[in-house]
Amino acid sequence: MKKKLILAAAGAMAVFSLAACSSGSKDIATMKGSTITVDDFYNQIKEQSTSQQAFSQMVIYKVFEEKYGDKVTDKDIQKNFDEAKEQVEAQGGKFSDALKQAGLTEKTFKKQLKQRAAYDAGLKAHLKITDEDLKTAWASFHPEVEAQIIQVASEDDAKAVKKEITDGGDFTKIAKEKSTDTATKKDGGKIKFDSQATTVPAEVKEAAFKLKDGEVSEPIAATNMQTYQTTYYVVKMTKNKAKGNDMKPYEKEIKKIAEETKLADQTFVSKVISDELKAANVKIKDDAFKNALAGYMQTESSSASSEKKESKSSDSKTSDTKTSDSEKATDSSSKTTESSSK
């Protein structure tokens, strides 16, 4: 899914790049009595929200590529390219058609992948994992377990499967006959997963980790958040391992969890982007895009407004202080006069 999204985003950027980088007077289309130039097209699309997003991403990726591009190897790019291709083909699509639909060639797509990889490298360069981060990761961690699963379409089917197993049915045989999970069905539902695995839904992991060896779960409902379809699972635990109290044997896994958690934290990501844009001295020259990066950087007008507010606040505080001092002096003088008259 991630590669699919990258491909789609790359397509949007490719269209915008074409308009932004081509000669403004060049004709894109001609017709009787009129033409459409690159400038016409650019002025039309730049106000659209998708163009604002594409521009924002273009600037961010360019900044990160300039600074972190040398950390990305051709091997990294080819690996990401192959993964994207495999994913499209696994879903029955043709990769060349997907590229054409996005307005890309293999060369331009690889360029986009390099920018994305440089962006990822830039985020990782800012990572600082604390002991608190590790403790948080440890709290939700569960070591890898060995289990068997049966996936079915309805709750009634799941209840029927559970009853069949309870009545002495062989789990492996039932999985091969009735499970709809194509990845595990042939092997009798056998699967391994830990708390970070994406091969099984979170609901299934949560229920499975509570099972003892040999125990079979009740039907578990799991909703796919992309399709909003609910499927049902019955799980048999083969080998469940308690993590204990010592984090050290799982140090590598815990650190990875902490890093992934921070990289998914939008506050962290926004701060990194903001710092990098500031360091690169990014200036927006076209008013149509002055707010495209507003979430990451202050515009000159907003900065001036902020300074003006601070100045007013400071003047107000100074005035209040002077007034207070004057009142104190008047009060003191009054008391002195009263004392003299007495």
UniProtKB/Swiss-Prot annotation:
Where in this protein does the record put region Disordered?
A: 297-342
Q: Which residues form the signal peptide?
A: 1-20
Q: Where does the record place the N-palmitoyl cysteine lipid attachment?
A: 21
Listed under catalytic activity are: [protein]-peptidylproline (omega=180) = [protein]-peptidylproline (omega=0)
Q: Residue spans with biased composition (Basic and acidic residues)?
A: 306-330
Describe the function of this protein. Plays a major role in protein secretion by helping the post-translocational extracellular folding of several secreted proteins.
- Start and end of every PpiC domain? 142-235
* UniProt-listed InterPro entries: Foldase_PrsA, PPIase_dom_sf, PPIase_PpiC, PrsA_foldase, Trigger_fact/SurA_dom_sf
| Protein name (database record) | Foldase protein PrsA
Compartmental location:
Cell membrane
For bias kind Low complexity, which ranges apply? 331-342
Kindly give the membrane topology term recorded for this protein: Lipid-anchor
Q: Name one GO molecular function term.
A: peptidyl-prolyl cis-trans isomerase activity
Residues where lipid is bound covalently (S-diacylglycerol cysteine): 21
**A GO CC term assigned to this protein in UniProt:** plasma membrane
Q: Which keywords does UniProt give here?
A: Cell membrane, Isomerase, Lipoprotein, Membrane, Palmitate, Rotamase, Signal
